[in-house]
Amino acid sequence: MFSSITLRQLKNSPISTLKHTRNFASTMEGFKELNVTMPKPFVYKVELNRPKKLNALNRAIWFEIGKCFDILATKDDCRSIVLTGAGKIFSAGIDLPDMIALGGKLAEHEDVARKCKILEQTLKDYQDHFTALERCPKPVIAAVHSACIGGALDLILAADIRMCSSDAWFQVKEAEIGMAADMGTLQRLPRAIGNQSLVNELCLTSRKIEPTEAKDCGLVSKVFDTRDSLVAGALEMAEQIASKSPVAVQLTKRTLVHARNNSTQTGLDFIRYWNMAMLQSEDFINAAMAQATKSPPPAFAKL
């Protein structure tokens, strides 16, 4: 495969170590309920920013989440994303006053068909905003401290990697407030932990999941002692991902997401057709040659 590549070509190729920039910081403006920053090169941090309301998920923050991740999906200076929460807890879940306001909107109509149409479109919009994390080709790492309740669990289940601090706890809250979870938990939790009996128990009883159990069952992959070490660890992993070829990383995520809902053969077809193009990328050639010659990892062009 490499016979046509000479050492001179290798020498002239853009192989160099990705430099870590100290005190690197940038902010993406235009959001009220989110704090979006770029603490490291190619790494964005999206922070739920309603600490006085325990980061409860109201209509505004829901829509901002969808908008933010759709924007980051297209930014060539974004290669990985860390999702956190400001304040005492990650998120208390659905903002109940917001739900009550929706009830008032439904009360304006007497006909059940018209009420159903409003509610169906609202739920569809909300689902789409959370699915933006999964739809985004850049890997998303959810870093959870303290409480992650109801709709917040729906949110992090759309992330690619989940980790938490030792004070974290998770709860499928919806059954306790008289509803079934409708933003992704019932669809994504079974795939995340792979134990249908445990999924049924958690969703039907609404009991809390502590960090040790969360790691043991696969809900999270890492548990950190403190919130600070959690965020630092998440950013370190995001930086590691960002140092890889964006061509490779983004196609890997797309293929993993595709594989969840398709057969093995369909998944093999999917990656084969994609790699017909991607294996011709300079990223593959440069990364492979760096490995073969034991050179430092290359710096990759924006994508």
Model-derived regions: residue spans:
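Terminal peptide-recognition signature
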Residues: 46, 50, 64-65, 83, ...
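Short, active-site-adjacent cap segments at secondary-structure transitions
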Residues: 88-92, 149-150, 298
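C-terminal long alpha-helix characteristic of the crotonase
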Residues: 40, 163-168, 220-269, 277-280, ...
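Short loop-to-helix capping motifs
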Residues: 50-51, 244-245, 281, 294
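Charged catalytic carboxylate motif
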Residues: 60-64, 125, 132, 233, ...
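Crotonase-fold acyl-CoA enzyme core
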Residues: 131-246
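Glycine- (often His-adjacent) and acidic-residue-rich active-site loop
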Residues: 77, 85-129, 178
